[in-house]
């Protein structure tokens, strides 16, 4: 469990005690963020998604940020030395766990080659299998 607070554009949003926190782009919204209770986001969306992982309060919810928003995370408490930091599913081997992390949209875009098919057709067949016309 970790304790952290997060701010958007300098405004404190919440102090959270949870198993972790996920920040994601639209591309990652159908992965771990979705399983933690986050929404499915259209691939054209340029902002960030923030999802607390198993928070210890029912009031902690996913938050969708715009492309110009800056997310600041500050990890608190005694458990920070036991926390792991992952980037795209890969653990980052850092000498020490950072106490502050800033997330914002980069200057350059990354293009992904998709396996074909319409995004919403794929969403419908994958996540809403019982839906028939």
Walk through the language-model features, giving the residues of each.
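Catalytic phosphate-donor-binding core of small-molecule kinases
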Residues: 1-18, 22, 30-133
């Amino acid at each position: 469990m970790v304790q952290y607070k997060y701010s958007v554009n300098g405004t404190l949003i919440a102090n959270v005690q949870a198993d972790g926190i996920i920040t994601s782009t639209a591309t990652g919204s159908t992965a771990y963020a979705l399983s933690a209770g986050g929404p499915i986001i259209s691939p054209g969306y340029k902002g960030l998604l923030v999802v607390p992982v198993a928070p210890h309060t029912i009031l902690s919810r996913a938050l969708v940020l715009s492309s110009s928003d800056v997310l600041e995370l500050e990890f608190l408490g005694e458990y920070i030395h036991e926390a792991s930091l992952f980037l795209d599913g890969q653990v980052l081997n850092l000498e020490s766990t950072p106490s502050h992390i800033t997330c914002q949209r980069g200057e350059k875009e990354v293009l992904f080659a998709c396996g074909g098919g319409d995004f919403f057709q794929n969403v419908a067949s994958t996540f809403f299998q019982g839906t028939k016309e």
